[in-house]
């Protein structure tokens, strides 16, 4: 399969050159939708790293690892688990023939514990590193230490869409090569929709639940002939289920499929949401569709502006999920999903 249609192809020559030096360290900055997750690992395989060992691509989410492996295997025309595979908790599609493996940061951390020298691994690629995690940060430090010690043949690549790279470049050392690729982005019109206010029956007014607000905007969007597939961002599984249930019962949704998309969903259902069919779709997703995955056919994005994020709760003495507003950078990333195929 030829990946020449991906914007990331513009840095192929630079990447090949950077991989030829001893103990290569590469920091790659490329926007969401540039094809770095699906394009860079095959380029590294073309450079001969797959002949020397496994190219490990670290993802922050299980769903991303699973779907990316399936997508790359399909693009290369190979069976999943043979040349291209993945390993996440409770699932392992890797064989002795595997050259590219998509794994979670937790899985890499486990491998580093079981095989401290990462025998049989030729390269480690940290994808979506801007989605920082303790496990990912620790694993990067251990891999860099390993490269400075017994594994000087190991290639280390860190890829990010939005991260400020100056500090990371300094941490990775003076030998780190910085590459930057451009994305392919059509103009996107951003419209803020203030929620309608409804009475609570006691003389007070308040916005309706966010799934009702989202349904109002989706109804307006699908009236347009050129709205394409619609991607709705919700903060969590509960809100996604309520939104899907509400949309599925609307008569104006006739002729459109509606799919949920989140990490704990069954793999078969995730595939249905991501793979494009003949019927227009409305996909209701968590922030996994913000950077980790590119869903083809999306021309309209409905953003709740919220996310559930893990954080320390001093009253409970444990990590819990907090409902918070997204950052300006995240809002731009979500809006940009509407500009991948057309204005």
PLM regions and their residue ranges:
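P-loop NTPase motor module signature
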Residues: 1-343
């Amino acid at each position: 399969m030829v990946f020449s249609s991906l914007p990331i192809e513009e840095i192929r020559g630079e990447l090949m050159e950077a991989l030829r030096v001893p103990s290569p360290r590469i920091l790659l900055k490329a926007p969401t939708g540039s094809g770095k997750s699906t394009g860079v690992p095959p380029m590294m395989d073309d450079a001969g790293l797959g002949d020397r060992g496994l190219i490990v691509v670290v993802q922050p989410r299980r769903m991303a690892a699973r779907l990316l492996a399936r997508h790359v295997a399909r693009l290369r025309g190979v069976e999943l688990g043979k040349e291209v595979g993945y390993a996440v908790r409770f699932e392992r599609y890797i064989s002795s023939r595997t050259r590219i493996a998509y794994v979670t940061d937790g899985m890499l951390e486990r491998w580093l514990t079981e095989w401290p020298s990462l025998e049989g691994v030729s390269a480690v690629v940290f994808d979506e590193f801007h989605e920082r995690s303790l496990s990912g940060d620790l694993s990067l430090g251990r891999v860099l230490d390993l490269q400075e010690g017994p594994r000087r043949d190991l290639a280390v690549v860190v890829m990010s869409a939005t991260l400020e790279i100056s500090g990371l470049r300094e941490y990775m050392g003076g030998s780190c090569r910085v590459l930057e690729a451009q994305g392919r982005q059509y103009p996107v019109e951003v419209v803020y929709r203030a929620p309608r206010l409804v009475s609570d029956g006691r003389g007070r007014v308040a916005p309706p639940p966010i799934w009702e607000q989202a349904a109002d905007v989706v109804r307006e969007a699908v009236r347009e002939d050129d709205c394409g597939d619609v991607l709705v961002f919700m903060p969590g599984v509960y809100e996604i289920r309520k939104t899907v249930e509400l949309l599925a019962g609307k008569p104006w949704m006739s002729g459109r499929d509606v799919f949920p998309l989140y990490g704990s969903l069954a793999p078969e259902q995730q595939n249905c949401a991501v793979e494009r069919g003949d019927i227009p779709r409305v996909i209701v997703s968590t922030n996994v569709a913000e950077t980790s995955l590119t869903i083809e056919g999306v021309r309209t994005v409905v953003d709740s502006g919220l996310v559930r994020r893990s954080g320390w709760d001093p009253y409970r003495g444990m990590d819990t999920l907090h409902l918070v507003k997204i950052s300006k950078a995240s809002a731009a990333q979500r809006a940009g999903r509407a500009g991948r195929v057309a204005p």
